[in-house]
């Protein structure tokens, strides 16, 4: 009955039923979404949220799925992906990007227009929406340094503007994590620069990233937040956990702050390995690591042997 109603209310919207999320995540793990939706514009997005709210169905936006782990039991209700909301425009020294825009590609737009300030993000996988939500950063730069404002979707399906000063930015944190609002688009203030110098800096940062990070395997990016006065990777190395493996997921031998899916690992492998590393590092150094990666969805129901 509800499927008929959904087909009528959301006619023309790209919706996939019982769709495995591991097809879309950087980790290559994750169970099915009841309904996976790809809105083409804000009008379709509003229709999806309105339908979900009216039918008491949970909904969430799954950005670019780069810095998160979806559990093997999947996600109930609607999962919304912004892949088709990806327009980027340049007006003077301001770049406006829709939430589904690829972060790395957006830094290339800035480079093409000789605008400086976005170089730090040139190798960070993910979407603009996720980058604002997490206050993504690297090599001394972060989104909070350049954001002007963001248009966000409230849980009621309304769109409003939040100025950068009201984002309550912190280390890998924004107010959006507290109120569960979702970025629809964001404006960034950049400065005029020299194309060659910008290009050289982006090349340098990408070279550093390739040297230090395990880009050859699926991963969820940096797993842990930087603990005060320490480096997570260093603490993990000191606990002799490089190469430590559970199932198909292991602590990278290239950078201990990363976990890589080397042999068809599961979300449970990731979760168990994260918990084990936290426990062992605490035992070894007394420092409690805090995950930077988000873990969402339901655990897989294990069938008991009769």
Curated annotation (Swiss-Prot):
Reactions catalysed: UDP-N-acetyl-alpha-D-muramate + NADP(+) = UDP-N-acetyl-3-O-(1-carboxyvinyl)-alpha-D-glucosamine + NADPH + H(+)
Pathway assignment: Cell wall biogenesis; peptidoglycan biosynthesis
Keywords: Cell cycle, Cell division, Cell shape, Cell wall biogenesis/degradation, Cytoplasm, FAD, Flavoprotein, NADP, Oxidoreductase, Peptidoglycan synthesis
Cofactor(s) listed: FAD
Any GO BP: cell division
Enzyme Commission numbers on file: 1.3.1.98
InterPro entries for this protein: FAD-bd_PCMH, FAD-bd_PCMH-like_sf, FAD-bd_PCMH_sub1, FAD-bd_PCMH_sub2, MurB, MurB_C, MurB_C_sf, Oxid_FAD_bind_N
Active site: residue positions: 172, 222 (proton donor), 292
Gene3D superfamilies attached to this UniProt entry: 3.30.465.10, UDP-N-acetylenolpyruvoylglucosamine reductase, C-terminal domain (3.90.78.10), Uridine Diphospho-n-acetylenolpyruvylglucosamine Reductase, domain 2 (3.30.43.10)
Subcellular location: Cytoplasm
Cellular component terms (Gene Ontology): cytosol
Main subcellular location of this protein, as a coarse class: cytoplasm
One function term, GO molecular function aspect: UDP-N-acetylmuramate dehydrogenase activity
Domain (FAD-binding PCMH-type): residue spans on this chain: 28-193
Stated role: Cell wall formation.
NCBIfam families (UniProt xref): murB (TIGR00179), PRK13905.1 (NF010480)
UniProt similarity note: Belongs to the MurB family.
Protein name listed in UniProt: UDP-N-acetylenolpyruvoylglucosamine reductase
Encoding gene (name): murB
